Amino acid sequence: MKISIIGAGSIGGAIARGLAKGTLFKASDITCTSLSEAALQDLKKGYPDIHITQDNLEAARSADMIIIAVKPWHVEGIIDEIKPVLQLDRQII
């Protein structure tokens, strides 16, 4: 299962690290996005197999599950941005 985490800040980064450390998912099946290149590079240092990008649409396109981990006032904009690639069989959290 491919998982994309949109927003790799404090919460999204913690979710990504927890999933990558666990046994249910491989780090190589996780993609994280952030506006902050520094946050992405920090995540990549600890988990080199995690995919990183600043392109939310790219991340959502390849995901079976999308976790939106941004501040509440950004959620509507993120949904509007990724809407073109959303499908009924994809889970959004």
Would you name each region that the model predicts?
Residues M1-Q54, E58-S62:
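NAD(P)+-binding Rossmann beta1-loop-alpha1 motif at the extreme N-terminus of oxidoreductases
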Residues H51-I93:
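Rossmann-fold NAD(P) dinucleotide-binding segment
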